[in-house]
Amino acid sequence: MELIFEKSKKGRKGYKLPELDVEEVNIKEYLPEEYLREELDFPEVSELDVVRHYTNLSHLNYAVDTTMVPLGSCTMKYNPRINEELVNKKEFLNVHPLTPEEYIQPLLKLVYELKELLKELGGFAEVSLQPAAGAHGELLGLLLIHAYHQDRGNKEKKVVLIPDSAHGTNPASAAICGFDIKVVKSDKKGELDFEDFIKKLDERVAALMITNPNTLGIFERKIKEIAEELHKRDALLYMDGANFNALVGRFKPGEWGVDVMHFNLHKTFSTPHGGGGPGAGPVGVSERLKPYLPVPQIEYDGKKYYLNWNIEKSVGKILAFHGHFLVWLKALAYILTYGKDIKKVSEYAVLNARYLKHLLKGVFKDPYPESPCMHEFVLSATNLTKYGVRASDVAKRILDYGFYAPTMYFPLIVREALMIEPTETENPDTLKKFALILRKIVKEAKEKPEILKKAPHRTPVRRIKEAEANRNLILKFKDIKE
């Protein structure tokens, strides 16, 4: 398929500007030449060319609208279209973030309602909606932990414990906040090794970051005991909320002793992934961390809703304005639509994952056969390496059959990992079809491994030389032509 640049023809236009209704000036008379911008080298195409080009491109995409996207730890569920219609109403789109509070009381009410619902669902004392994404929420959570220890004079607490199965953002966020990292091993059941945790839990530990269910899709059964041991030493428990889709409506992390957790609205509450944003990663906290929340907090005094800037020990502001309002609205609509039945989200997410894992029994190696999965599971393709086939080959071959691939090679503690999360929005027929395709691919691996090693065969872009592509980045169309 041609690139949009290859469709360009000099002089072809897709727009017409209105006639100038003010006096024309020569900008060169007012600005020195070094400040003048050069004309951008945009492709010259008609409007119809653009519409056809991007419509055709969209038909080549793998997306939730066209197929199942079983990316583990991503929760690629269906995003209700009515929510998009809702947030595109001019009453929401045209509100400036500096509009005085008295003119936006209904909107502040909606935001306050979302905050209260997240507090209830998470079992927390308070929630900040401000973070712009999950990793941003992580950063805020660690800033709150840092502020807590500084306030209490715990200058020695500079270590954050992180499981070896953790998301990569966990150690990155902790390091950005100035903490040292110590890794805690997983045990043979795929849970945090409690003995190793206790051994590394000394007076220097500020917090433990844990995901529950963890990235293996396994529930951390000792979560309450972990919280108790941390609190005995005035250390805190951070829970990564990436996998909250397995818990929502059934469990409240705050009741386990979790001190801080970020919610991924794009996962659990169906605000869309991708497109570079905007996202939202609200953070729920226990009473311990409530005094340090960022400003402003949205409050209600019984008569009006307002932005509270008067939080004495606040870590300050972490976003230019107040947060991503339209994303909040989508999450609020999603929660209100389910109401008290929101627990069905987690029930069906877990049911679908367990059913799909059952359908794939014996197809790949199960690294933790004794542990039931929650909303996702990890299998290992090490049983195919003797045929010269790796997990990445399996993933690329899946594309030929119309499904997107699972997450590969994560978590790092499982060799040749395939991390699969079907979400609650897929039906049993889709799961059966996906399982049949994987069985067929494994049969191909054993009988005709070259098919997998050269896959994909039916996608617009075939197999790329990944190592070469990483070393020799081509980021511009002109570089391709040269």
From Swiss-Prot:
Annotated GO MF terms: glycine binding; glycine dehydrogenase (decarboxylating) activity; pyridoxal phosphate binding
E.C. code: 1.4.4.2
CDD domains named in the record: GDC-P (cd00613)
Cofactor(s) recorded in Swiss-Prot or TrEMBL: pyridoxal 5'-phosphate
InterPro entries in alphabetical order: Aminotrans_V_dom, GcvPB, GDC-P_C, GDC_P, PyrdxlP-dep_Trfase, PyrdxlP-dep_Trfase_major, PyrdxlP-dep_Trfase_small
Gene Ontology terms describing biological process: glycine decarboxylation via glycine cleavage system
Keywords attached to this entry: Oxidoreductase, Pyridoxal phosphate
Domain of life (superkingdom): Bacteria
GO CC entries: cytosol; glycine cleavage complex
Record keyword Oxidoreductase present: yes
Record-listed N6-(pyridoxal phosphate)lysine modification sites: 267
Catalytic activity: N(6)-[(R)-lipoyl]-L-lysyl-[glycine-cleavage complex H protein] + glycine + H(+) = N(6)-[(R)-S(8)-aminomethyldihydrolipoyl]-L-lysyl-[glycine-cleavage complex H protein] + CO2
Principal EC category: oxidoreductase
Family: Belongs to the GcvP family. C-terminal subunit subfamily.
Subunit structure: The glycine cleavage system is composed of four proteins: P, T, L and H. In this organism, the P 'protein' is a heterodimer of two subunits.
PANTHER family: GLYCINE DEHYDROGENASE (DECARBOXYLATING), MITOCHONDRIAL (PTHR11773:SF1), GLYCINE DEHYDROGENASE, DECARBOXYLATING (PTHR11773)
Protein task: The glycine cleavage system catalyzes the degradation of glycine. The P protein binds the alpha-amino group of glycine through its pyridoxal phosphate cofactor; CO(2) is released and the remaining methylamine moiety is then transferred to the lipoamide cofactor of the H protein.
Record-given protein name: Probable glycine dehydrogenase (decarboxylating) subunit 2
Species, as recorded: Aquifex aeolicus (strain VF5)
